[in-house]
Structure formats: structure tokens, C-alpha cells
Swiss-Prot record:
Keywords: ATP-binding, Carbohydrate metabolism, Galactose metabolism, Kinase, Nucleotide-binding, Transferase. It comes from Schizosaccharomyces pombe (strain 972 / ATCC 24843). This is Galactokinase. Belongs to the GHMP kinase family. GalK subfamily. Alpha-D-galactose binds at R47, E53, H54, D56, D209, Y266. The keyword Translocase does not apply.
Length: 519
């Protein structure tokens, strides 16, 4: 079983020289603050999701890749019963976490939003893992975790849709485990514990972000599957000649703060999709496996149960692409039939409760208690269309990759790939309502200036778009985005800010421990 690697140099980066200067700067900051060298570094990269958005928590496969930007944390242990959190970014002020002397797991005040809360949630899951697997390290729970002195450095844009929070949490969890004497952890275990970390700050993530960050490999994208179990399969992407394809990521600089806007955005989608699955199940008198974060059914669960109970066919195992596409098409056909034109507009709470055969109180208890949300009407028809259509597009992209041969027309491949990305953006905009005016604008500019496809990546409502182009068209695309979006929207933007906003990345190495032989 693959374990998280430890590196003794920086050759795992695509640009080791640039990162050597970054590590040296972080080391200098650490020595100035704590008057000692760090024992080690922990790092985890951001990710870009190529296609498949808001479908991971419905257990449908997605296609992300780890990218060159990452979160690094420099670490040393301390005899003090506290954790000192610092950051090279002055926006993130120092925080001190007092460790309970009785060895209890720390708690989080969810009403007080600070960057330190993401470390707290990392400490909670790391501590629980230690209690479960290595209780002797903490005297069976009677002894606190080791005190830590930490400085973080991250170049994953916060709120940019590139999973800065997952990168931060995974790097933090790795740091805590290593500092407390756990030198080896499987990638599978690290995914399991990190997936639930952000739940402690009220964000119900589905697992794709953490999986992509942990399993990333240089020059390989990832197929992340959630059934029959959570797993990531690296695969090489087609090499096109004479001009290879490239992904450009543009941060709109409109921050998508999942924690603060979850009530009406991210968490509402989680709830709407859970309601949608139970709505469809009720139509066919099906009992769904309780596998969502709300302990309800999921849209994947509905599809599998429909095929098993109504059509007497086995559950889809996720590997047969043609079968998957056919089943998504059937789900989309059913969706159109099962919702009346009036219902397609949206449901009030009372209407949904009636459809599910519940009182308003029962509906509230099942769907609106565990994850707080705010809405006027739930648009469960739209969310259903988005989930099944984007899940189908993931499979269509996979098929495109598998079928491509070196002798094939690269232009034909790029047009087909781009069309699927554009269809995904249209669905995010119209059916999932997770795009934004700024995201629509950068996608429009892209398609007029050398982009084959462009779509919102990450949670949405701001953040970043991913653009598909080729190396020969890259300079024109960067210039167009710079002149027509960034300089218009942000006239005072600096060159360094521009460089951070527009990222061209190849698939990068995943999470690791770094113990440099020399500093």
C-alpha cells in the first residue's frame, strides 16, 4: 500500500531552483521567530479539478490533478503544552493554541472564523487517529499531544478554488502526526482522516480535494472514484504534437470563502442534492443507503438502487465507461419526467415535506438540522440535472483520453475536449448556479483568445477557472486575460499579483514530508 513519501531534496518540484529560494526564506523566518532550525517540513499541493464539480459528495468520479502551488509548514516540537501558529503572510496573525493538560481532544468555536480553525480541525482528526492507531504515544489519551512551533508558507490562492484549505489541512495533519512520532502513514489512511477535517469548521467536503492533493504525481492526472471505495488512479494524459495541451488557471480574485458563505452556497448544494435523491427515491418507492453527510441517500445511490430494484441490473462499479454514460443518460431522462414544470422552478419547504410524506418538523430534523442552510426555494431539479450531466461528462472525457492515438488529429481532440469543458461550465452556471459574473467573463475572454474550453473549477461563486489551450496559443491567452479582465477589473494590480493570479501548471507531486540534508 502506497505511503506518503519523505524527500531529502526538492527534485520532486517541476521548478526546484525557485522552490529552493522559497524554502530558504521560510527557514530564515523560522530561525528569526523561534531561534532554532525546523525539524522538518510538511507540504501538500493545491489541485485543479479538470472536470466534475459538486458531484464528489454524490459519489461520482472526478478528474483533478495536483498542481505546483502548495502549502509548506516548517515544524519543530516543544516541551510547552501549546501550539504556536505563524504564517509568512502578515494577513494571518499569530495564534496560540493551548493543549488540554488532561489529553482531551481540542474543540473549535465555529462562530469565531480564524485561519487557526483549519489547524484546529486538523489537530482534532490527527489526535483521533493517534488515539485509535497509536494510543501508547499519548498514554491512552491521558497525555496531551506534543507542543509545536510552526510557520506556514502557502502560494495556493485562498478562496481561489484551488483547494487551499485542503492543502493546508493535509500539510497540518502530516506535520502533527510526524511531530508526535508517526513516521509512516499510508496515503489511504491520510485521505480517510483528512476528508472529514473540514467538517469540524462546518464545510461538508466530499473527498476529492484531499485525494488529489495526497495522490498527486508528476505529469499525471487522477481519476478519483468514491465507489466501491475512495481511491485515486493516476493516468498519463495524451501528448499532442506539434503543440501539446496545457491548462491555465485564472483566479478571478473574487474570493469564494466556503466557511462564511456555506449557508446559501456550498452547504445548500449538499442539502439540495440529498433532498433530490430522496425525492426521486419516493417516486419509485425505493429505500436508499444512508450514505450522505446528512445520513440520507445520494444521487449515485438512487441510480444504483433504481437499476437493481426496477431493472434487475447490478450496481455500476464505476469502471465500465459506456455503461456509466448510458446510465447517466437514463437518469437525465427520468429527471425530466419526474418533475412537473412547476416543480422545476423550485420547492418551498412545505412542498418538499409533502412530496416526501413528512411533516415540516420531520423534514427539518432530517435535512435542515445537521447542516445549517438558508434558502427561499430549493432547486432540486436543477441540481439533479447538473450532477448526472457532469458525471457523464467526466466519463466522456475519460473515453476521449483512452481512445486517442498519437496518429489522431490533435485539433479534433482539443475541440472535443473543449466542448465538454464548456458544457460543464454551462451546467455550473445554469443548473448548479455556482458560477459568477467574473467567472463567466474570464471564460468568455478565453474562448475568444485561444482557449478551447473553460470552466469554473472548485466550489465556485468566485475563485478560479481552468482553461484548456495549447502551448502555441498560451501567450495570447495570458495577454487577453491580463488586458481584458485583470487590468480592467483591478487597475492597480501589480505584476507579482498578476503572476500569482494566472497559473500555468503541469500535474505535480502530492503530499510529502521534506527533510533536507542541508539548508
Amino acid at each position: 500500500m502506497a505511503t506518503v513519501p519523505t524527500y531529502h531534496d526538492l527534485s520532486f518540484y517541476s521548478n526546484p531552483k525557485e522552490n529552493k529560494a522559497r524554502y530558504a526564506k521560510l527557514l530564515n523566518s523560522f530561525e528569526q521567530k523561534y531561534h532554532c532550525k525546523p525539524d522538518f517540513f510538511s507540504r501538500s499541493p493545491g489541485r485543479v479539478n479538470i472536470i466534475g464539480e459538486h458531484i464528489d459528495y454524490n459519489y461520482f468520479s472526478v478528474l483533478p490533478m495536483a498542481i505546483d502551488v502548495d502549502v509548506i509548514v516548517s515544524v519543530t516540537t516543544s516541551d510547552d503544552a501549546k501550539v504556536e501558529l505563524n504564517n509568512t503572510n502578515p494577513e494571518f496573525k499569530e495564534e496560540i493554541l493551548e493543549l488540554p493538560s488532561d489529553g482531551a481532544v481540542i474543540e473549535i468555536n465555529k462562530t469565531h472564523h480564524t485561519w487557526g480553525n483549519y489547524f484546529r480541525c486538523s489537530m482534532i482528526v490527527a489526535h483521533k487517529y493517534i488515539l485509535e492507531k497509536y494510543p501508547e504515544l499519548v498514554s491512552g489519551g491521558k497525555k496531551p499531544l506534543k507542543g509545536l512551533k510552526l510557520i506556514f508558507d502557502g502560494n495556493v490562492p485562498t478562496g481561489g478554488g484551488l483547494s487551499s484549505s485542503a492543502a493546508f489541512c493535509v500539510a497540518s495533519i502530516l506535520a502533527i502526526l510526524k511531530a508526535n512520532g508517526i513516521n509512516t502513514i499510508t496515503k489511504e489512511d491520510l485521505v480517510k482522516i483528512s476528508v472529514v477535517s473540514e467538517h469540524y469548521v462546518g464545510v461538508n467536503t466530499g473527498g476529492m480535494d484531499q485525494c488529489a492533493s495526497i495522490y498527486g504525481e508528476q505529469n499525471k492526472a487522477l481519476l478519483v472514484q468514491f465507489k466501491p471505495k475512495l481511491m485515486a488512479t493516476p493516468f498519463k494524459m495524451p501528448v499532442l504534437k506539434p503543440h501539446d495541451m496545457v491548462f491555465l488557471i485564472s483566479n478571478t480574485l473574487v474570493e469564494a470563502n466556503k466557511q462564511e458563505t456555506a449557508l446559501t452556497n456550498y452547504n445548500l448544494r449538499v442539502v439540495e442534492m440529498a433532498v433530490a435523491s430522496e425525492f426521486l427515491a419516493k417516486k419509485f418507492n425505493l429505500e436508499l443507503p444512508k450514505e450522505s453527510n446528512l445520513h440520507t441517500g445520494t444521487l449515485r445511490g438512487f441510480m444504483d438502487e433504481y437499476y437493481e430494484k426496477h431493472l434487475k441490473q447490478p450496481h455500476w462499479d464505476g469502471s465500465d465507461i459506456d455503461m456509466g454514460v448510458q446510465r447517466m443518460q437514463e437518469m437525465l431522462r427520468l429527471t425530466e419526467i419526474m418533475f412537473s414544470e412547476e416543480q422545476k422552478v423550485g420547492f418551498k419547504t412545505e412542498e418538499l415535506a409533502k412530496e416526501l410524506g413528512l411533516s415540516v418538523e420531520e423534514f427539518t430534523k432530517v435535512f435542515l438540522t445537521k447542516i445549517p442552510v438558508k434558502y427561499e426555494r430549493m432547486k432540486i431539479y436543477q441540481r439533479t440535472v447538473h450532477v448526472y450531466s457532469d458525471a457523464m461528462r467526466v466519463l466522456q472525457v475519460l473515453k476521449l483520453f483512452h481512445q486517442h492515438k498519437d496518429s489522431d488529429d490533435p485539433q479534433k481532440f482539443m475541440l472535443a475536449f473543449g466542448r465538454l469543458l464548456n458544457d460543464s461550465q454551462r451546467s455550473e452556471d445554469i443548473y448548479n448556479n455556482s458560477s459568477s459574473p467574473e467567472l463567466r467573463e474570464v471564460c468568455k475572454i478565453s474562448l475568444a483568445n485561444g482557449g478551447y474550453g473553460a470552466r469554473t473549477t472548485g466550489a465556485g461563486w468566485g475563485g478560479s477557472a481552468v482553461h484548456l489551450t495549447t502551448h502555441d496559443k498560451l501567450a495570447k491567452l495570458v495577454e487577453a486575460l491580463t488586458e481584458q479582465y485583470y487590468k480592467k477589473q483591478f487597475p492597480k494590480i501589480t505584476q507579482s499579483e498578476l503572476n500569482a493570479a494566472v497559473v500555468v501548471s503541469k500535474p505535480a507531486a502530492g503530499s510529502c514530508i521534506v527533510q533536507l540534508a542541508e539548508y
